[in-house]
């Protein structure tokens, strides 16, 4: 759920590090193909993100898949989406000198977000929601203002975005 482009995070060797330019281009094309199989809109939205990455004033050296981090260890009664868990990862990466990009589905960039932890609802047919507190809302806004938060459009597959983000500085 996290990729650091120098190939290591602490003592953990990451599997995608060191791909050739040709291999990275192939990964990018595969992601575009996957998006186009879903819909033309999905492909166009992913192309916009590709443009965001190419045109951004700096290169990101770490990409954080926000939902996976925010829901880490939250499958218990009372578990919830926790932006402060994302902040903890971002803070460590920035302290190590990385320029961090956080990807989050747009539905998690609002004041009220879905809660998809295992014990969020008593019945699978119900969707629980949770209100973010002021600190969590301010955190998302701060990341947005710093240009390090990308809100994946609704109904788009967010995994394609963080994976694409990792292909620009490997």
How does the language model describe each region?
Residues 1-170:
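Noncatalytic, typically N-terminal accessory segments of nucleic acid-processing enzymes
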